[in-house]
């Protein structure tokens, strides 16, 4: 017993496919930019978009197949099984190693039915009003799929949040069973106590 009472399963699904078509588009974009004397903001974000297009593209999910004992299966038909099987494996391991004890387990990717072993959070998001709205809309959907233990990265995982946006994230988070503030290393420090302008409102809500 190493004292481990829970797992946070992250990055538990195929995401980077590097398909020839998307790689070709990226290198063509990069080559075109390398010939320009002055790059502007649109050039930069255009390059970022071409990099981001290399991952999690639905077209890529449908473009390759798995050879199985039962025949060939297109990847998009089994994509969520990766997260679902990982959730089940971790949940059953806890039941074996810590029988009769409660455990903490939530995952990034999963499948309907896996809520019997663990919860889910909505994955990396951004510090923006549109992402806050998207997470508010997504939460009832995952809960109707059985994942009652669910939540989002409050304040946004990437980019810098603002005091007012952090306050609204907290208002949303108070209604989620998995309430956690989470950000990447490049974002501003966003613990709620850092937003002194809205601290009285934060304190009253908590």
Residue ranges with predicted function:
Residues 1-206:
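Catalytic-domain carbohydrate-binding cleft regions of carbohydrate-active enzymes
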């Amino acid at each position: 017993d190493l004292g481990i009472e829970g797992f946070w399963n992250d990055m538990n699904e195929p995401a980077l496919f590097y398909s020839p078509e998307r790689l070709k588009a990226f290198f063509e974009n990069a080559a075109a930019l390398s010939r320009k004397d002055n790059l502007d903001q649109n050039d930069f974000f255009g390059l970022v978009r071409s990099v981001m297009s290399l991952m999690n593209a639905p077209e890529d999910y449908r473009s390759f197949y798995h050879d199985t004992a039962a025949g060939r299966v297109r990847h998009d038909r089994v994509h969520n099984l990766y997260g679902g099987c990982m959730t089940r494996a971790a949940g059953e391991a806890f039941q074996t190693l810590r029988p009769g004890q409660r455990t903490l387990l939530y995952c990034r990717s999963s499948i309907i039915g896996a809520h019997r072993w663990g919860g889910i959070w909505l994955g990396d998001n951004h510090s923006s009003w549109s992402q806050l709205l998207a997470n508010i809309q997504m939460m009832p959907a995952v809960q109707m799929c059985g994942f009652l233990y669910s939540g989002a990265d409050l304040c946004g995982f990437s980019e810098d949040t603002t005091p007012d946006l952090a306050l609204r994230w907290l208002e949303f988070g108070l209604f989620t069973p998995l309430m956690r503030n989470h950000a990447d290393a490049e974002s501003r420090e966003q613990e709620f106590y850092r937003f002194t302008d809205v601290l009285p409102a934060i304190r009253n809500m908590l």
